[in-house]
Amino acid sequence: MFGLGGQELLLILLIILLLFGAKKLPELAKGLGKGMKEFKKAQTEIEDEFNKAMSDPPEKKEKESPSDKG
């Protein structure tokens, strides 16, 4: 995971605990979870739009003839 071992992750968690305190950790985790959910939702929407655009046939544009310009 990001090239981090168990000791590094434990150290990072300890620093976060010291900075924010035990009472703030659930709030931080909840906010992080919501952010990840929003990110995945946006990613899915973009993928769906891309797949739809790739599966739809291209629209043919009619060229204007010189007689149409008037």
UniProtKB/Swiss-Prot annotation:
Presence of keyword Lipoprotein: no
Metal-binding listed as a keyword: no
Subcellular location: Cell inner membrane
Positions of the UniProt region annotated as Disordered: 47-70
Pfam families according to UniProt: TatA_B_E
Recorded superkingdom: Bacteria
Listed transmembrane segments: 1-21
BP terms from Gene Ontology: protein transport by the Tat complex
Topological type in the membrane: Single-pass membrane protein
Quaternary structure note: Forms a complex with TatC.
Name of the protein in its database record: Sec-independent protein translocase protein TatA
UniProt organism field: Prosthecochloris aestuarii (strain DSM 271 / SK 413)
